[in-house]
């Protein structure tokens, strides 16, 4: 029987030592478990993560209220529902909460239930989750965005931009691309050590050295690619991209250094330089001409629509421009962006929106309008590997899930290795074809 008999939540710990929600869903013949991630730099338009705010316990970060909501309200309402009816389950969860941002029950409570139900449904159907969600066409392994060097809100250093990532695009198999990423990661570690810079890793497994400038940060990554025996591709030479093995992706997290009063982008961690929206867009255009950059996420602040438009006009034809804080996995905000012609890609974080159904709707809307989707982790993660399954299920072609260290990140990469093995000769690794620029 596929009828839900019990839903139980508990408080567990995430990769940063903060509490998060884990949910178990039972039917008479199947079981599903999901753990919920949490972000450090969060967009103001995200669904609400319910915290206890009792400063005497876990510094206010406890999630017992969300756990109680699952064990009482949600458990009672969903018992007797068919676990394979995902859309009905998610609609019921939205009805129970009754708010647009899930502030009553908490997006962390709702998401845990939604994902655990999907896993229980997959087990009941005797299918891997990627096949259960995506059907027989699910066969594309994603190109990894590997966060190897950190700054911004993710590091105590002099780098303004949050993430410098490598994307191994010049390969035919996911497993070979993963090997490349690991080799570049270790080459970067050796390079930093040789320069007397820190090799300690941050929340997502990337290094956070105290380098002299934003430029030095990206140049270190490019040098490490060469030291590993690979070639960095050039973003403007479309015909020659196949000659390169690795390209650079950036997540500046520009909302974090945007001064809303001055309406300026302030490089407060490095030079103190202040740039207007037009100057910031020109700054990225200059970087895209000088460095092998294939993707920039949140190159402009989340509500700087004019700046986003300028950036898209300048480099949107040759660089993937990903909206994270801008779109927050929300179909309504993505629709607004499509109408205004800003960006050409959306970052997909399941906890930004709160249900699997809404996540899949955002991916579908992006696909129908020529936008790419990048399935993403959060800085606070667990051993849960659902996002790896979603990446393959939707044939998204790209995944952002940290560096080549920390088991909370490696769990996703390893799950993708298992899926590649399971798919065998039908597995597709898109490489540069994952991009539409």
Curated annotation (Swiss-Prot):
**What's an example of a GO molecular-function annotation for this chain?**
phosphopyruvate hydratase activity
- Which reaction equations make up its catalytic activity? (2R)-2-phosphoglycerate = phosphoenolpyruvate + H2O
How does the cofactor bind to this protein, according to its record? Binds a second Mg(2+) ion via substrate during catalysis.
Which positions does UniProt annotate for (2R)-2-phosphoglycerate binding? 162, 349, 378-379, 400
Q: Where does Mg(2+) bind?
A: 251, 297, 324
Q: Does the keyword Heme apply?
A: no
**GO BP term, example:** glycolytic process
User: Where located?
Assistant: Cytoplasm; Secreted; Cell surface
* Main location class: cytoplasm
Q: Where is the active site?
A: 204 (proton donor), 349 (proton acceptor)
Q: What EC number(s) does the entry state? A: 4.2.1.11
GO terms for CC? cell surface; extracellular region; phosphopyruvate hydratase complex
- Pathway, per record: Carbohydrate degradation; glycolysis; pyruvate from D-glyceraldehyde 3-phosphate: step 4/5
Chain coiled-coil ranges: none
Origin: domain of life: Bacteria
Record key words, sorted: Cytoplasm, Glycolysis, Lyase, Magnesium, Metal-binding, Secreted
**Cofactor(s) annotated in UniProt:** Mg(2+)
Report the function annotation for this chain.
Catalyzes the reversible conversion of 2-phosphoglycerate (2-PG) into phosphoenolpyruvate (PEP). It is essential for the degradation of carbohydrates via glycolysis.
Recorded family membership: Belongs to the enolase family.
Q: What is this protein called?
A: Enolase
The organism named in the record is Chlorobaculum parvum (strain DSM 263 / NCIMB 8327)
């Amino acid at each position: 029987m596929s009828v839900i008999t019990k839903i139980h939540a508990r408080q567990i710990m995430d990769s940063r030592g903060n509490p998060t929600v884990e949910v178990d869903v039972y039917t008479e013949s199947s079981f599903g478990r999901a753990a919920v991630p949490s972000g450090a730099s969060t967009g103001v338009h995200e669904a609400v993560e319910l915290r206890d705010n009792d400063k005497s316990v876990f510094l206010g970060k406890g999630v017992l209220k969300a756990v109680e909501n699952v064990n009482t309200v949600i458990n009672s309402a969903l018992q007797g529902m068919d676990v394979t009816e995902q859309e009905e389950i998610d609609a019921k969860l939205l009805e129970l909460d009754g708010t647009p941002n899930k502030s009553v029950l908490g997006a962390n409570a709702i998401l845990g239930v939604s994902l655990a139900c999907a896993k229980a449904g997959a087990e009941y159907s005797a299918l891997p989750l990627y096949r259960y969600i995506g059907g027989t066409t699910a066969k594309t392994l994603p190109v990894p965005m590997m966060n190897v060097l950190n700054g911004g809100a993710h590091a105590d250093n002099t780098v303004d931009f949050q993430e410098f990532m490598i994307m191994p695009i010049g390969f035919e198999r996911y497993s070979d691309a993963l090997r490349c990423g690991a080799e570049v990661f270790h080459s970067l570690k050796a390079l930093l050590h040789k320069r007397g810079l820190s090799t300690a890793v941050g929340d997502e497994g990337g290094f956070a050295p105290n380098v002299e400038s934003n430029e030095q940060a990206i140049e270190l990554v490019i040098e490490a690619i060469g030291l590993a025996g690979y070639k960095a591709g050039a973003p403007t030479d479309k015909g020659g991209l196949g000659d390169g093995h690795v390209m650079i992706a950036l997540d500046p997290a520009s909302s974090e250094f945007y001064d809303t009063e001055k309406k300026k982008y302030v490089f407060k961690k490095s030079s103190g330089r202040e740039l207007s929206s037009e100057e910031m867009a020109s700054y990225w255009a200059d970087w895209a001409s000088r460095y092998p950059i294939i993707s920039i996420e949140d190159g402009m602040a989340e509500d700087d629509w004019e700046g986003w438009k300028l950036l898209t006009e300048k480099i949107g034809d040759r660089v993937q421009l990903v909206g994270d804080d801008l779109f927050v996995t929300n179909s309504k905000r993505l629709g607004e962006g499509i109408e205004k012609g800003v960006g050409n890609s959306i970052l997909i974080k399941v906890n930004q929106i709160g249900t699997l159904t809404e996540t899949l709707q955002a991916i579908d809307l992006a696909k129908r309008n020529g936008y790419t989707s990048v399935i993403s982790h959060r800085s606070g993660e667990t051993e849960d590997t659902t996002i790896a399954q979603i990446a393959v299920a939707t044939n998204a072609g790209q995944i952002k899930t940290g560096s080549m260290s920390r088991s909370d990140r490696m769990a996703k990469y390893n799950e993708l290795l298992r899926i590649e093995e399971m798919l065998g000769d039908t597995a597709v690794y898109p490489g540069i074809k994952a991009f539409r620029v």
